[in-house]
Design a protein with these regions (language model features):
Chain B
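A structural motif at transmembrane helix-loop-helix junctions in multipass membrane proteins
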Residues: 134, 139-173, 223-228
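Junction motif at the cytosolic side of a transmembrane helix
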Residues: 211-228
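Long, hydrophobic alpha-helical segments
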Residues: 57-73, 77
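Hydrophobic alpha-helical transmembrane segments of multi-pass membrane transport/permease proteins
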Residues: 25-47, 63-65, 171, 175-182, ...
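Transmembrane helix boundary and interhelical loop/hinge segments in multi-pass membrane proteins
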Residues: 70-90
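Membrane-interfacial helix-loop-helix connectors in multipass membrane proteins
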Residues: 45-56, 120-141, 186-202, 225-227
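Aromatic- and glycine-rich beta-strand/loop motifs that create alpha-glucan
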Residues: 1-28
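Hydrophobic alpha-helical transmembrane segments that constitute the membrane-spanning cores
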Residues: 101-126, 146, 150, 183-184
Length: 211, 228
């Protein structure tokens, strides 16, 4: 591990560990994530994948070890808005349509110039369902209604917890396409998965979690 | 990276909560009906004697409105916690306390405002003299947001626990005592033709304090609730 790269890694964890009531959940864990890099977080159920992502998002506090963001000690305010977290709970309001949910997210997080919301919803595969209340959508469509934030919100680091769950084959390809596009423009992503998915086609970086 | 404008974020959140409340307008009607029924029970229980009802009218309306607000209180953050919206809100590049203040405002508009609208009706049923009516409305306009703000802190503190409804009531009602004393004091002073400005000013002062501090306390409490 080189200590002084020309550009510091976007995210760096050193001996990161987490305990719940003195029971180790995971760690110690060392990894680096540079801009343009996509990594797959692997591990069995209960190995702490979700916990790791929640720590990196800033929802849980770092118990042990060190976390650095763009070369500096991790601070909640420094990364707010630069990180997009998509957890098990999708953060969608069932009584609002996909379009309205997206408008709220864009209001809070800001949005990219391209694409527009209508275009983003079409590309994510919700054409014709934009104005349907989200609670009437299928599980896969709900997932897409949450994933559409990836297209619109301007975050550098994506933390995606099981983004492939409930998605069909075209949905999985869609997520892979989004990840590839994100990496190409200098974004980074951590993606958890417990199952075998055709992740980005090639051989991705892997972060292995041990309980 | 430039952060999205604060005003747009506030507007988006306020609009979202108001639209959500409107799509479930049956829930808005519930506390109103509850207050209507409770206020109707008093003449039945105490007899329709005008002098008695007149004397208790202000206090009955205040307590009824307070209890009706309590019914809707524990739903303030529950939906957002269950569907993950709160996580998205906490991680948004916006001051969390201000965002929560918007949520509390939306909650006040959808639960307390309808109650204030029917308060003259309730007070009229109990023969409150017309001269005291503006003071009652003023006291309610100051007391209800105060209760929303105090309630929001407790809702945030009990957010991690299940079945927090009863616990919430037990924690909030003692805090309501000074609010009720000042609000009812103002109304009864107005009824007796005495100066009523002092208790109303106290309510206003407490509201100003809560407006600043309660959202901050809510933000801290909800961060802790998520960090568990």
């Amino acid at each position: 591990m080189t200590a002084s790269p020309a550009r510091p890694a976007l995210l760096e964890a050193r001996a990161l560990a987490f305990y719940r009531q003195d029971e180790p959940v995971f760690g110690p864990l060392d990894f680096q994530l540079a801009e343009g890099e996509i990594a797959l977080v692997e591990g069995d159920n209960g190995s702490g994948k979700t916990t790791l992502l929640r720590i990196l998002a800033g929802l849980l506090h770092v118990e042990e070890g060190e976390l650095r963001w763009r070369g500096e000690a991790w601070q909640r305010d420094a990364q707010l808005g630069d990180v997009l977290f998509l957890g098990h709970h999708l953060g969608l309001k069932g009584d609002l349509s996909a379009r309205e949910n997206l408008a709220v997210a864009a209001g809070l997080y800001g949005r990219r110039d391209e694409p527009g919301p209508a275009d983003a919803l079409r590309r994510i595969g919700l054409a014709g369902y934009e104005d349907e209340p989200v609670r009437r959508l299928s599980a896969g469509q709900k997932k897409r209604a949450a994933l559409v934030r990836l297209l619109l919100l301007p975050a550098t680091l994506w933390l995606l917890d099981e983004p492939y769950a409930n998605l069909d084959r075209t949905g999985i390809e869609l997520v892979n396409g989004l990840l590839a596009q994100h990496a190409a423009r200098g974004g980074a992503a951590l993606v958890t998965s417990h199952g075998a998915v055709s992740f980005l086609g090639g051989e991705p970086r892997r972060i292995r979690m041990h309980a | 990276m430039s952060r999205p404008p604060l005003a747009a974020a506030c507007a988006a959140l306020l609009r979202r909560d108001l639209v959500l409340a409107w799509r479930r307008r049956g829930d808005i009607a519930m506390p109103v009906l509850y207050a209507l029924i409770v206020a109707t029970l008093f003449p039945f229980a105490l007899g329709p004697e005008e002098a008695l009802l007149q004397r208790i009218a202000g206090g009955v309306v205040l307590v009824t409105v307070l209890l009706a607000m309590l019914l809707a209180l524990d739903a303030m953050f529950r939906g957002d916690i269950e569907d993950g919206s709160l996580e998205q809100l906490v991680l948004a590049p916006q001051p969390l306390a201000l965002m929560l203040a918007m949520k509390i405002l939306a909650h006040w508009i959808t639960t307390a405002l309808p109650l204030i609208v029917i308060a003259p009706l309730l007070a009229g049923m109990l023969h409150l003299p017309g001269a005291a009516m503006p003071v009652l409305l003023l006291a309610l306009l100051l007391a209800t947001p105060l209760l929303s703000l105090l309630g929001a802190i407790l809702v945030a503190l009990t957010a991690g626990t299940r079945r927090s409804g009863m616990l919430l009531a037990l924690m909030l009602l003692p805090l309501c005592v000074p609010v009720v004393i000042f609000a009812a004091g103002a109304v009864s002073a107005a009824q007796q033709g005495l100066p009523w400005l002092a208790p109303v000013a106290w309510l206003g002062a407490a509201l100003a304090l809560a407006l600043v501090l309660a959202p901050l306390a809510c933000a801290a409490a909800l961060r802790i609730a998520l960090d568990a």
